[in-house]
Amino acid sequence: MSATTELQFQHVHKAFGTTLAVRDVSFRIASRSFGVVIGPSGCGKSTLLSLAAGLDEPSSGYVFLGGREVRGIRDDVALLFQNYNLFPWMTAQANVAFGLTMRRMSRRAASAQALNYLNDVGLGACAPRIPDELSGGMKQRVALARALALKPSILLMDEPFAALDYQTRKIMQRYLLATRARTGATILLVTHDLAEALTLADRLIMLSGTPGTVQEVIDIKAPHPRDLSHPVLAGLMRKLEAHLEAEAASSEFTTEERNRIMADG
């Protein structure tokens, strides 16, 4: 793992053709800390993850990881999408082991380590099953096990727990916090779940608008586990809710626009 895993965006713009996705985005996530990005749909949250992962490049500005500019995919970065990306013909255990064998670990050792990570996410008994035999929430946990098995310096996560029930989501949140504490990885997570954001974040990045811009960066000093009924956290929750409600109101169609769309449809 890198000596420093600080992630930094400096005046990043990203356009797709003539459409600007994010505009002048700057923020920093310190080494070994947990950053969470929230904002309305369409504000470029997933775009930021792709830029941090090296899957795409900024139109202007810079992204740094560990003091080095991100240019292309790095071995010490793991990205967990909403859609799992599991190999459908492989068992859960083989899916987790695959990346380890690509790093020249023996198949036997990779298989054993994969089973350990599946046990960590509560799916050891599902190791011999293929993805079609798993629920959506189970697939998400297999994908999480696969990402963590690589022991990344930075873990980038896009709505990783969206398909999980409430109880399993809380278990996975605690597991993720424990893993961060144990490995020292830096984590950047995108979520629409405000309770999840306040439960996990050391630093909260609030995006607004389309194209997405940084409205505010909020540091949360509360220790874990957190009681969201605490006055400070409850106040933050109200602030975040008001922010998203204002964003939703500003993006609503006018009556004239809605009528025109209906007429064209």
Predicted regions and their residues:
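Extended, non-globular alpha-helical segments
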Residues: 163-166, 235-264
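A general structural signal marking secondary-structure boundaries and capping sites
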Residues: 59, 125, 152, 208, ...
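Conserved catalytic segment of ABC-fold P-loop ATPases
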Residues: 199-206
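Short hydrophobic beta-strand elements within the C-terminal catalytic ATPase subdomain
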Residues: 65, 206-207
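ABC-family P-loop ATPase nucleotide-binding domain
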Residues: 1-13, 253-265
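ABC family nucleotide-binding domain
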Residues: 2-184, 188-192, 200
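Conserved beta-strand-loop-alpha-helix hinge in the C-terminal portion
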Residues: 209-239
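Residues within helix-turn-helix
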Residues: 195
